[in-house]
Amino acid sequence: CFGGGSNFGGISFPFMRHNILEGKKTRFVAAEPASCPKLTRGKFQYDFGDEAGYTPLLPMFTLGHNFAPAHIHAGGLRYHGAGVIVSQLLKDNLMEAVDIQQLESFEAGCLFAQMEGIIPAPESCHAIAAAVREANKCKETG
């Protein structure tokens, strides 16, 4: 799941060096809520990291520090911008991003709970939904 980038960065950054240094072709896909699509619909520009405008201006994919996202169940994913490092990686095409509708994320979370016996957090359901999309693409294409 992707809110500001720490979760995504923590899991993907250790592996990205293989793509950069060794020419591997691993895909890194961030899954963000469609109601707060800073990576898929935001602009790469300098913006404040906080709503009040107290931080220095930072280069990021952003919806604008005044953006007020809809109230969604995954409250941790409502941040207006993406971290500086993640933003640069997306700008440099070293990663991808998809947006996930809330209902699709909940359906994926229910499927995961039924199959694995673990109830995921609403935020994590976005990443699960993206994984289900990828699995279905592979099923269709062979």
PLM feature spans:
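Glycine- and other small-residue-rich loops at beta-strand/loop junctions that grip anionic moieties
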Residues: 1, 98, 120-123
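Glycine-rich ThDP/TPP pyrophosphate-binding loop and its adjacent helix/strand module
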Residues: 1-25
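Short glycine/serine/threonine-rich phosphate/pyrophosphate-binding segments
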Residues: 3-12, 38-40, 124-131
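Basic, gly/Ser/Thr/Pro-rich low-complexity segments located predominantly at protein N termini
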Residues: 8-11, 15, 54, 58, ...
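Alpha-helical scaffold segments in soluble metabolic enzymes
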Residues: 10, 14, 76, 107-111, ...
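Active-site/ligand-binding loops adjacent to catalytic centers
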Residues: 20-25, 30-118
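C-terminal structured "cap/appendage" subdomains that terminate the fold
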Residues: 113-142
